[in-house]
């Protein structure tokens, strides 16, 4: 099993006042660094899905994949699947750039839950479909899904009967969508220190 990883960083950050979330800091470190350090050890190769100037990620030494047709997170997943397939990977594990506490066992738990098919994370009774596992075999179906105007991550996951991998810590998937979410994450860091 060859798992590749992808940090989804192509969003517009509207609820953060239009700020590029990858450039936000938490505990003095970039959000993209938090996710890279947590997801990177779980996968064979790691890349970033982002639009705009890729030079802003140069310090990470990771490939930056652009969306062919920006239509939300699934466009990034498609770019990642094509990259992973070209390199001989079996599946792609994704995590958004604004989930800095993503679990250190995300990839293996998704793989075990899905048994080689699609799988998404679940914690605290909530599904987190952007934290998912996507076999490279679904790439062309995803391209057709996007071409038909569909863009919902959970809709595509359901189309492929995605399994759910349960995680005990709901804070592991704390999504930093707004300034108050970032403040909450800072508070959690102080508690853990």
UniProtKB/Swiss-Prot annotation:
Keyword match Magnesium: yes
Matching CDD domains: MobA
Compartments reported by the entry: Cytoplasm
Keyword list, A-Z: Cytoplasm, GTP-binding, Magnesium, Metal-binding, Molybdenum cofactor biosynthesis, Nucleotide-binding, Transferase
GO annotation, cellular component aspect: cytoplasm
Documented EC number(s): 2.7.7.77
Any one GO MF annotation of this record: GTP binding
Record bears the keyword Nucleotidyltransferase: no
Broad enzyme group: transferase
Obligatory cofactor(s): Mg(2+)
UniProt binding sites for Mg(2+): 98
Function: Transfers a GMP moiety from GTP to Mo-molybdopterin (Mo-MPT) cofactor (Moco or molybdenum cofactor) to form Mo-molybdopterin guanine dinucleotide (Mo-MGD) cofactor.
Free-text comment on this protein's domains from its UniProt entry: The N-terminal domain determines nucleotide recognition and specific binding, while the C-terminal domain determines the specific binding to the target protein.
Cited PANTHER family: MOLYBDENUM COFACTOR GUANYLYLTRANSFERASE (PTHR19136:SF81)
Designated name of the protein: Molybdenum cofactor guanylyltransferase
Protein source organism: Cereibacter sphaeroides (strain ATCC 17023 / DSM 158 / JCM 6121 / CCUG 31486 / LMG 2827 / NBRC 12203 / NCIMB 8253 / ATH 2.4.1.)
């Amino acid at each position: 099993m060859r798992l590749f990883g992808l940090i989804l960083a192509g969003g517009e950050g509207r609820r953060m006042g239009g700020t590029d979330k990858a450039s936000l800091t938490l505990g003095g470190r970039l959000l993209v660094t938090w996710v890279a350090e947590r997801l990177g050890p779980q996968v064979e190769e790691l890349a970033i899905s982002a639009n705009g100037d890729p030079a802003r990620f140069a310090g990470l030494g990771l490939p930056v994949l652009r969306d062919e047709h920006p239509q939300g997170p699934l466009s990034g997943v498609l770019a990642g699947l094509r990259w992973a397939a070209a390199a001989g990977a079996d599946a792609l594990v994704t995590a958004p750039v604004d989930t800095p506490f993503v679990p250190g066992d995300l990839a293996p738990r998704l793989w075990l839950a899905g048994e080689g098919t699609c799988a998404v994370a679940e914690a605290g009774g909530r599904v987190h479909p952007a934290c998912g596992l996507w076999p490279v075999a679904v790439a062309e179906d995803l391209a057709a899904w996007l071409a038909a105007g569909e863009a919902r991550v959970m809709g595509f996951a359901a189309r492929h009967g995605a399994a759910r991998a349960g995680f005990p810590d709901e804070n592991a998937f704390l999504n930093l969508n707004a300034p108050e979410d970032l403040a909450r994450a800072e508070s959690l860091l102080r508690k853990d220190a």
